[in-house]
Amino acid sequence: MSAAARVLPKAVTFVTGNAKKLEEVRAILGSSVPFQSLKLDLPELQGEPEYISKEKARIAASQVNGPVLVEDTCLCFNALKGLPGPYIKWFLEKIGHEGLNNLLKAYEDKSAFAMCIFSLALGPGEEPITFVGKTAGKIVPARGPNYFGWDPVFQPDGFEQTYAEMPKSVKNNISHRGKALALVKEHFASASYTVQSNDST
């Protein structure tokens, strides 16, 4: 529990250029976290997912000179010891849904987990706080509308539908992103951040 509410100089900037991701984040967070979105060209880093996310948050906080929220998503195949992991975006661009299935062709184990890491840096020089959400499932031949990344090939455990086949409200409830954002909401509720209003809207 925080002793006193921290005053943020401005609303949190959620760094993304992905319209579908922004739509999901808005739907899940609602008005619980005041944020604006901005596309920034952040360097593509290599390393463990949490390290990548924190580094991006540090860089973004310096660029916007204020609080930022960045997100990194991984799709980890257990048979491949966690790959493609944080590099899923490039794998998908290069080999598509069928290629992702082909990666597991030689393996009986089609299990995978989706992981989402949000990092919140309250300003330049501040140590980012991370929030991690995971959903276990398996990789299947693509089913459902091809609107959003690898949604058509990921079927969460306990469901007969892929992410792509689910109603958005169901997906947002059980997804890796939904779970991570639930922790973000919890953090904002307990930290009682307030945004400085020189110019209130």
From Swiss-Prot:
Reactions the enzyme catalyzes: ITP + H2O = IMP + diphosphate + H(+); dITP + H2O = dIMP + diphosphate + H(+); XTP + H2O = XMP + diphosphate + H(+)
Cofactor binding note of this UniProt entry: Binds 1 divalent metal cation per subunit; can use either Mg(2+) or Mn(2+).
GO molecular function, one term: XTP diphosphatase activity
GO biological process terms, semicolon-separated: deoxyribonucleoside triphosphate catabolic process; nucleoside triphosphate catabolic process; nucleotide metabolic process
Alphabetical list of InterPro entries matching this protein: ITPase (IPR027502), ITPase-like_fam (IPR029001), RdgB/HAM1 (IPR002637)
Subcellular location: Cytoplasm
GO cellular component, one term: cytoplasm
Catalytic activity, EC: 3.6.1.66
Family annotation (Pfam families): Ham1p_like
UniProt xrefs under CDD domains: HAM1 (cd00515)
Keywords for this protein: Cytoplasm, Hydrolase, Magnesium, Manganese, Metal-binding, Nucleotide metabolism, Nucleotide-binding
Cofactor(s) for this UniProt protein: Mg(2+); Mn(2+)
Residues that bind ITP: 16-21, 56, 72-73, 89, 148-151, 171, 176-177
Residues that bind Mg(2+): 44
EC class name: hydrolase
Family to which the UniProt record says this protein belongs: Belongs to the HAM1 NTPase family.
Described function: Pyrophosphatase that hydrolyzes non-canonical purine nucleotides such as inosine triphosphate (ITP), deoxyinosine triphosphate (dITP) or xanthosine 5'-triphosphate (XTP) to their respective monophosphate derivatives. The enzyme does not distinguish between the deoxy- and ribose forms. Probably excludes non-canonical purines from RNA and DNA precursor pools, thus preventing their incorporation into RNA and DNA and avoiding chromosomal lesions.
Assembly notes: Homodimer.
Protein name (database record): Inosine triphosphate pyrophosphatase
Organism: Zea mays (Maize)
